[in-house]
């Protein structure tokens, strides 16, 4: 690859056309939006890079102290070390990634554990209708309807395109919910809280949309 092909010398740079779902292995879960004729939602444009955006910069996380907590309306509250989380059944998901700041990175391959697997293990109670994702960076949170959190293509990921997630991109583990704007895919995940009522997170408190569907351009609450 020449410098012209990758002007930023960026390992995440995509030269040429984005990966397509039909090129994926048979076991890979394909996010439905990658099969659209036009994969770029309204108001978005494709980036070949993977920009880094966050609210306050990466937190300092000692991997030996990292934990994922499953709390709230569950029959069995659970806590996982990183090794314990990675020992669960793994999935790979092929999806697109849409930032509310109007860029989209197409054709990402994630490796991790399905959110459905986690909800099953903690036995989320029937009255749970929402989740609040808690991150390690200064108490940052984001909310999701339970059905979005439990979509087949949603997971907690520790690899992107075959390599471990860097701290800048949310490593060691981040939430990935492909059919929502990317702020809903919380970096540096610390806990998942199952709730009866919706509860606005960090950006939602500032006016961002509670649902965040990119195909309906739900960027802000005023966009209702």
Task: Name each model feature, range by range.
Residues 2-224:
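Structured, non-membrane catalytic/scaffold regions adjacent to prosthetic-group chemistry
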């Amino acid at each position: 690859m020449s410098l012209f092909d990758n002007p930023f010398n960026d390992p995440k740079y995509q030269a040429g056309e984005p990966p397509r779902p039909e090129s994926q292995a048979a076991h890979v879960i394909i996010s439905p939006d990658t099969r659209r004729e036009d994969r770029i939602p309204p108001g978005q444009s494709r980036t070949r890079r993977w920009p880094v955006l966050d609210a306050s910069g990466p937190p300092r996380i000692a991997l030996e102290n990292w934990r994922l907590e499953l709390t709230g309306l569950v029959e069995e509250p659970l806590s996982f070390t990183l090794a314990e989380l990675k020992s669960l059944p793994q999935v790979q998901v092929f999806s697109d990634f849409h930032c509310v700041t109007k860029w989209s990175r197409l054709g990402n391959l994630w490796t991790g554990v399905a959110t459905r697997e986690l909800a099953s293990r903690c036995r989320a109670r029937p009255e749970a209708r929402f989740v609040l994702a808690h991150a390690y960076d200064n108490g940052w949170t984001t909310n999701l309807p339970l059905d979005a959190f439990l979509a087949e293509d949603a997971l907690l990921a520790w690899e992107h395109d075959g390599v471990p997630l860097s701290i800048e991109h949310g490593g060691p583990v981040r939430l990935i919910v492909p059919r929502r704007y990317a702020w809903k895919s919380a970096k540096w995940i610390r806990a998942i809280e199952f709730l009866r009522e919706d509860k606005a997170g960090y950006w939602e408190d500032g006016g961002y949309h509670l649902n965040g569907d990119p195909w309906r351009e739900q960027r802000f609450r005023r966009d209702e």
